[in-house]
Amino acid sequence: MTAAGRIGLAGWRHVVKLDPDKPLPAETVRRIAASGTDAVLIGGTQRLTRAKVLRLLWRLRHAPVPVCIEVTAMACAVPGADAYLVPLALNTGDLQWLSGRHLEGLARVGARVPWERVLAVGYIIANPHSAAARRAQAAEPSEEELAALVRYGAGILDLPVVYLEYSGSQAPDAMVEVAGRCLRRIRAAGGRSRLFYGGGIAGYESARRRLQQVDTIVVGNALYSPRGLAVLEETLAARDDALREGDPGCPTS
């Protein structure tokens, strides 16, 4: 069975992302994990340490859903996750974020990688003001460039996930529409990629709109606001309504 099959990736519509560098009370973490989300993703950009990642993973040890780690640094290469999502920054201006860091890591720990749990994820880091964009030297793509990036990740590389990330705020609606349209065409031709979106999802309306355009929404920064648990409930309600009413996300036709 593939890594995607092991974690039921095809059924994910709502994912929460928790940052090891932004601690939450243990009870809050427990409530998030048991909320009904489809998966929990551990990941971040800044000040990651092995101890922080392990601490958060330990708090999620009883989660009833898959707990996955976004491997953005060697500190994230710890045992115990259900899957490891390896980011390929498709629009990076520095090739170390597309292949360089990956080769360095594989040279160090490649013999111990649990390949049955590894998925490559094509990231399109579209908000130039985000920490991830600054680190990866990623510029905001035009609509034409975005279409090419989706076609490259989904059509050429056949990645299981293409992730449109607009961390910190909402992406322009037209940008998400372009990504969804390109991915639908590739999937209709036999492609397998799923489209994730993360950025600015802070309540029912923003979640519901994105669920009409993409396969999976990722709720992250808003969980750390004073309304964090309320945001979680609202976005899950949007997911449930989308499932009940048949919102297509990225259908095959």
Regions found by a protein language model. Give the residues of each.
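Glycine/Thr-rich beta-alpha phosphate-binding loop at enzyme active sites
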Residues: H129-G180, V219, Y224-P226, V231
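Conserved N-terminal beta1-alpha1 strand-loop-helix module at the mouth
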Residues: M1-P64, E140-V161
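C-terminal helical cap(s) of enzyme catalytic domains, especially alpha/beta-barrels
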Residues: L54-L57, R101, V109, N221-S253
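Conserved anion-binding
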Residues: C76-P160, G246
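Catalytic cores of alpha/beta
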Residues: I69, A73-P87, A179-C182, S193-I217
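Short beta-strand/loop segments at the ligand-binding rim of alpha/beta enzyme cores
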Residues: G8-V16, L56-V71, A179-G198
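Glycine-rich phosphate-binding active-site loops on the catalytic face of alpha/beta enzymes
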Residues: L41-R47, A83-L98, L157, L164-Y166, ...
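Active-site mouth loops of central-metabolism enzymes
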Residues: G11-A26, E70-M74, I125-A147, G198-A202
